[in-house]
UniProtKB/Swiss-Prot annotation:
One BP annotation, GO: heparan sulfate proteoglycan biosynthetic process
Topological domain spans for side Lumenal: 28-471
Tagged with keyword Manganese: no
SUPFAM superfamilies: P-loop containing nucleoside triphosphate hydrolases (SSF52540)
The name this protein goes by in its record: Heparan-sulfate 6-O-sulfotransferase 3
Reaction equation(s) it catalyzes: alpha-D-glucosaminyl-[heparan sulfate](n) + 3'-phosphoadenylyl sulfate = 6-sulfo-alpha-D-glucosaminyl-[heparan sulfate](n) + adenosine 3',5'-bisphosphate + H(+)
Organism: Homo sapiens
Length: 471
């Protein structure tokens, strides 16, 4: 009985051993787990170290990567967000600067929707604008008589933007800029007439940093003199553009510029056919310039033109008696100036914001149907940003520029609404284009398939008939 039982027991044991041996040969990855088959670690004891297989090595902790070759991290491209850089060293320090001679492919251009100064909050419109105010598309006829007029407000990034206009636009006949010359020749294709009125093309033809009041009364006459007499019968469109900047940053930048010796004393300030008298526009300093002026001294001058400069340069000054402060009371004057500046800014063909360089580029390109060669660069470090002021000084600057603060909030809201509206229209056109392409592809396939089916049927019929004849 015992012998028969041992025979029956021996067969399953041998079979089990055979299966275990075969399993070890067939499954090499099981080596580590099968070596201690049947041995379980006691409570509180760590089991034998297992060698991670290829499939589990990716999930292994870092200390188990010793035998795995460490590859260098992949190269990272330029970030889509803010790009800090030192302020460009030039006469007018500006936050944005074109990258000269650098031409990127289309897919490498920075996304204009990406945040430029850190994480931006979700945009919520504050002002109600009509569809006409938000839609900006200019049928700019560069081969005709149309002219772009750049209103350059001090310390708003105008020097950089002006260089973009003469050196960075893709044109049939680019502007000719020679080394050592401050002005470029921007002629229309096949003509010796200029299409751009700016510091770097025509110079300060209407005075140094001429404002809206001066330009609108001066530019038409200047352009008629420069133009050929035979073209005077044709109509001409003037498209005014400008740049705005955060009032506190702009004010500090102007203070630093004046501190280095800038005066702009040759500005004409023409209004109603004359310049202001010394009593109407006194100076803040007795000497040739205001070099070394402190911020407190700069703010204490009540007739400092830096105060509310953006509103004054965009408003129609003839509405308030020009620089004659006795023409009306101060409250009424401020109300009229602010409203006039808002209306003129809204009716301009284009305006950009220094703090949003890429969105400025995007809107300009869509407005005038012109493309820039190199993308705009956002500089976050300027001389103004390096100035450390306390909260009291900042509040004082905001109070001195209370009109500019209101204008900038209005301008920023209009700018953002125009940008989002333009992006939305562009997305709609792209979707419509894709739908049209898919529809054409379907029609093309539908036209091809019946012909192929018909040809196949004809071939079968012909073969059958020929076989019948043969039979």
């Amino acid at each position: 009985m015992d012998e028969r039982f041992n025979k029956w027991l021996l067969t399953p044991v041998l079979t089990l051993l055979f299966v275990v041996i075969m399993y070890q040969y067939v499954s090499p990855s099981c080596t580590s787990s099968c070596t201690n088959f049947g041995e379980q670690p006691r409570a509180g004891e760590a089991g034998p170290p297992a060698v991670p297989g290829p499939a589990r090595r990716a999930q292994a902790p870092p200390e188990e990567w010793e035998r795995r070759p460490q590859l260098p991290p992949p190269p990272r491209g330029p970030p889509e967000g803010p790009r800090g850089a030192a302020a460009p060293e030039e006469e007018d320090e500006e936050p944005g600067d074109p990258r000269e001679g650098e031409e990127e492919e289309e897919e490498d251009e920075p996304d204009p929707e990406a945040p430029e100064n850190g994480s931006l909050p979700r945009f919520v419109p504050r002002f109600n604008f009509s569809l006409k105010d938000l839609t900006r598309f200019v049928d700019f006829n560069i081969k005709g008589r149309d002219v772009i007029v750049f209103l350059h407000i001090q310390k708003t990034g105008g020097t950089t933007f002006g260089r973009h206009l003469v050196k960075n636009i893709r044109l049939e006949q680019p502007c000719s800029c020679k080394a050592g010359q401050k002005k470029c020749t921007c002629h229309r294709p096949g003509k010796k007439e200029t299409w751009l009125f700016s510091r770097f093309s025509t110079g300060w033809s209407c005075g140094l940093h001429a404002d809206w009041t001066e330009l609108t009364n001066c530019v038409p006459a200047i352009m008629e003199k420069k133009d050929c007499p035979r073209n005077h019968s044709h109509t001409r469109n003037f498209y005014y553009i400008t740049m705005l900047r955060d009032p506190v940053s702009r004010y500090l930048s102007e203070w630093k510029h004046v501190q280095r010796g800038a005066t702009w004393k040759t500005s004409l300030h023409m209004c109603d056919g004359r310049s202001p008298t010394p009593d109407e526009l006194p100076t803040c300093y007795p000497g040739d310039d205001w070099s070394g002026v402190s911020l407190r001294e700069f703010m204490d001058c009540t007739y400092n033109l830096a105060n509310n400069r953006q509103v004054r340069m965009l408003a129609d000054l003839s509405l308030v008696g020009c620089y004659n402060l006795t023409f009306m009371n101060e409250s009424e004057r401020n109300t009229i100036l602010l409203q006039s500046a808002k209306n003129n800014l809204k009716n301009m063909a284009f305006f950009g914001l220094t703090e949003f360089q890429r969105k400025t580029q995007f809107l300009f390109e869509r407005t005038f149907n012109l493309k820039f060669i190199s993308p705009f660069t956002q500089f976050n470090i300027t001389r103004a940003s390096n100035v450390e002021i306390n909260e009291g000084a900042r509040q004082r600057i905001e109070d001195l520029n209370f009109l500019d603060m209101q204008l900038y909030e209005y301008a920023k809201d209009l700018f953002q609404q125009r940008y989002h509206h333009t992006k939305q229209l562009e997305h709609q056109r792209d979707r419509q284009k894709r739908r049209e392409e898919r529809r054409l592809q379907r029609e093309h396939r539908d036209h091809q398939w019946p012909k192929e089916d018909g040809a196949a049927e004809g071939t079968v019929t012909e073969d059958y008939n020929s076989q019948v004849v043969r039979w």
